[in-house]
Each structure stands twice: as structure tokens, then as C-alpha cells.
Amino acid sequence: MMSISLIWGIAVVVSCCIWFIIGIRRRKVGEPPLDNGLIPYLGCALKFGSNPLEFLRAKQRKHGHVFTCKLMGKYVHFITNSLSYHKVLCHGKYFDWKKFHYTTSAKAFGHRSIDPSDGNTTENINKTFNKTLQGDALCSLSEAMMQNLQSVMRPPGLPKSKSAVWVTEGMYAFCYRVMFEAGYLTLFGKDISKTDSQRAFIQNNLDSFKQFDQVFPALVAGVPIHLFKTAHKARERLAESLKHKNLYMRDQVSELIRLRMFLNDTLSTFDDMEKAKTHLVILWASQANTIPATFWSLFQMIRSPEAMKAASEEVNGALQSAGQELSSGGNAIYLDQEQLNNLPVLDSIIKEALRLSSASLNIRTAKEDFTLHLEDGSYNIRKDDIIALYPQLMHLDPEIYPDPLTFKYDRYLDESGKAKTTFYRNGNKLKYFYMPFGSGATICPGRLFAVQEIKQFLILMLSYFELELVESHTKCPPLDQSRAGLGILPPLNDIEFKYKLKH
């Protein structure tokens, strides 16, 4: 009579054989090279997740510029030749770029699908974003952000005795605190009936946001939030504060949120909590990448004496041209849209900081079987497969960016000091050379506001404060690879700096 262990052993072997026979995808003629990985369902996910850049470089050396990997039950076709990016986007009629994003949003934030085709709402969310994050609406949003940044950085009633004192703080913690509060107030307004407790309210939301955001990569990967009790409670607290009954009590709510409240109330079947969670999506999208992007921009600027000098001269010149004067009385600074757009040095600093820290994954799902025509050849793609671009491969390509791991503040400036828009690879001009915000239909709708608020932050830091790193020769902190694929990677550890108000 067979032992229990032998029976289990046979069962495992049989299961593995069945999986090998029917569970492994076979490469067909005309398809890209295929790597199923060794682990059922996960495929190559663990290796990819540990270091996506090195994983893709290794696969590129083995298979060429186009290859397929099984990741979490999905088959992902990676296109790694930056000269082919524009060709991918030309196949837009075969792609469903919404499916992945809508599914991920519902999974991470806990609301029903916001895809109009699923019947829960008829709101076109992209149309809403385009209407409220461009043109005159962007001007109003930027003006509010500038006011809130100054209020947070230089709170009214600050004793003069404290103005000349050096304050030492973690730079990432500082950027997190300032950008979260100013951004929250800009989008969701202020409760003027609770002025004294406003800061405590923001701090509580900041703490909850950190707890929720910490597990966000796991949620995107499909891990149920109920396994993270602290993060689950934090998400529910954040959503509770964004219920319409609470937002109606706040003043100076942005046009974006006011319009979304109206459309949620008139076009959706969401309950109060689900409506609030769709606003939580916007809170997360406005903070999760902007905060680390702000840190990297400030850190790289302070760390480079040449960048600090060039940026300070540009900001001082812009303020003088605008008739703005800094004084010990703390006069507010205001630069309009045209003036903010005419700061090529700051633009280049921000772009270079994001080039070195962005690790987004541009994803599109195939709506049907089709043939993808690229510079490297033609490939057959199956329905429901995923096409993916990983721009970090391009951002760190030495053929495009010489000495790619070195911060060069003027990398995006031409010889005349204006924005440089021409880059080459193998002698061929690139149509896409900088993609921290995505591309095509999936490009981030809030990218213009994000860049402007980082620029405003840098302007105010240079205008109001003397800035120094505690250790002048501080090394650049490593990137937190656990968030690879989600956008801008935060530092793995904080960096101490010190600041004091200028006189």
C-alpha cells in the first residue's frame, strides 16, 4: 500500500505535467520570442519585479528588441527599441488602453468600474481631465497652488526670531509634507470653519496616505487590500473625508473636483463611499509621483553648484522682469502662466531629475489578433495580450544620453539656452526621447500641472530660503525599486538638508 507522501508526490508530478501540457503557452510562427518563466501563473514576475531594468536588458541581449514574458498570468510583449515607439503608437486602433487602467483603479481603490461600457457611470473621465487641467482651468489651479505653497512654507505669524535659524530636516520628508498639504488644499479646498484644526486634519490625511500608498504596488499586483489591515483602514479614512457631504463644507474646491462631484451625482450609480473613492484616485494620482519628483528636482539642484547658480539667476531675472520684490515682510510671489513657461533652466533641471528617477510602464491591451509592424520587423499579437514600453531603457541609453547616470542640469538646453528637442540614436532622430508621463492616449492628463507645481516649489525655495546639504558631498540615494512600473521612484533613504529664511 502506497504511503501518503508517495501519493502526494505522484499528485504533484501529475499536476506539473498537466500544467506543462495545457498551461504553458507555445510560441506560434510570427510571434516574438517567448519566456513563460518557471513558476505557474507568476511566470517571470518575481525576476522582473526585483529589478525591471536589468531583467529587460538581459532579455534584450538574449532575444533582441521585441520579446514576450509571462507576468502574473498575462503575456506581455516588451518593445525595447526606442526608434520603434512611434510605430507602436500608430497601431492605436488595435489597442484598448482603458481596460488595464480602469481594472487597476477599481482593484486598488475599492470602487466599481468607472469604464462607461460597464454601466456604472456615463462620465468620460478623460474629457473631464482635459477640461479642468488645461487652459484657463490650469491657470486657476496653478495660481491656487502658488498661494498654498507660500502659505505652507511661510505660515502667517512666523516669529522673526525663528527666521534666522537653520532648520535641519530630511529632504524627502520636507517635500512630502509641503507638497501634500499644498496639493490637497489646492484640489479639495479648505474648511474655513475649522482654521485652527486645518493643519491637524491635513496631518491625519498625510499619515493615512502614507499607510495606503506603502502597499499600493501590492494592490496593483492583485493582492487583496484586506490582507493589509492598516492600509485598508487608512484608505477608508481618506475616502470618508472625501465624501460629498464633507467636500460641500470646504471652500475654494478646485474646478476639477467640483465638476467630478456634479458628474458623479448626475451620471453615476455609485453610492457615497464609491464617489469618494473616485476622488481618492485623483488625490493619489496628484501626489504619489509628484512628491518624489519634487524631491529629486530639489536634491539634484542643490547637489550641483552649477545648477543652483543657473537656476537662481533665472528665477531672480524672472522675478525682476515681473516686478516682484522679495522682502523680509514676506510679500507673496506670483508668476503667470507665460512667465512660468519661460524658465528653460528650471525645465531642464526637472526633466533631467525625472529622466534619472522615472520607471513607468506604458501598457496597452490588444483588442483583437493583429500584426504589429515595427522597425525591427513584424510580429503577430494575440487578443488580450499586453504591449508594454519601459521608457527607463531609453532614458538610461548611453547612445541617446551620454554618461546617462550623471545629472547634467543643462542636458535639455541647446546652445542658445533654449529647450532642446532633438535627440538621436544610431544617427536616427527620435520622435520619443523623454517619457516619464507616458505616451499617446495613456499620457498623464495632469502632467502640465505636475511640472508647474514642481517649478513653483523650486522658485519659492530659491527665493525664500538659503539651502545647504548637511553633508556637502552626499551621494545620490538609491532608487526604491519596489515601485518600479508606477512612475517616479522615491529614494530608498532620506537625505538631510538645512534651510533658513533669507533676510
Curated annotation (Swiss-Prot):
Keywords: Cholesterol metabolism, Endoplasmic reticulum, Heme, Iron, Lipid metabolism, Membrane, Metal-binding, Microsome, Monooxygenase, Oxidoreductase, Steroid metabolism, Sterol metabolism, Transmembrane, Transmembrane helix. InterPro entries: Cholesterol_7a_monooxygenase, CYP450_sterol_14alpha_dmase, Cyt_P450, Cyt_P450_CS, Cyt_P450_CYP7A1-type, Cyt_P450_E_grp-IV, Cyt_P450_sf. It catalyses: cholesterol + reduced [NADPH--hemoprotein reductase] + O2 = 7alpha-hydroxycholesterol + oxidized [NADPH--hemoprotein reductase] + H2O + H(+); 4beta-hydroxycholesterol + reduced [NADPH--hemoprotein reductase] + O2 = 4beta,7alpha-dihydroxycholesterol + oxidized [NADPH--hemoprotein reductase] + H2O + H(+); lathosterol + reduced [NADPH--hemoprotein reductase] + O2 = 7alpha,8alpha-epoxy-5alpha-cholestan-3beta-ol + oxidized [NADPH--hemoprotein reductase] + H2O + H(+); lathosterol + reduced [NADPH--hemoprotein reductase] + O2 = 5alpha-cholestan-7-oxo-3beta-ol + oxidized [NADPH--hemoprotein reductase] + H2O + H(+). It is found in: Endoplasmic reticulum membrane; Microsome membrane. GO terms for cellular component: endoplasmic reticulum membrane; intracellular membrane-bounded organelle. One of its GO terms (molecular function) is cholesterol 7-alpha-monooxygenase activity. Its main location: endoplasmic reticulum. Heme binds at residue 444. It is a single-pass membrane protein. The keyword Iron applies. One of its GO terms (biological process) is cellular response to cholesterol. Its cofactor is heme. The chain crosses the membrane at residues 4-24. Pfam families: p450. It is an enzyme of class 1 (oxidoreductase). Gene3D superfamilies: Cytochrome P450 (1.10.630.10). A cytochrome P450 monooxygenase involved in the metabolism of endogenous cholesterol and its oxygenated derivatives (oxysterols). Mechanistically, uses molecular oxygen inserting one oxygen atom into a substrate, and reducing the second into a water molecule, with two electrons provided by NADPH via cytochrome P450 reductase (CPR; NADPH-ferrihemoprotein reductase). Functions as a critical regulatory enzyme of bile acid biosynthesis and cholesterol homeostasis. Belongs to the cytochrome P450 family. This is Cytochrome P450 7A1. It comes from Mus musculus (Mouse). The lineage of its organism: Eukaryota, Metazoa, Chordata, Craniata, Vertebrata.
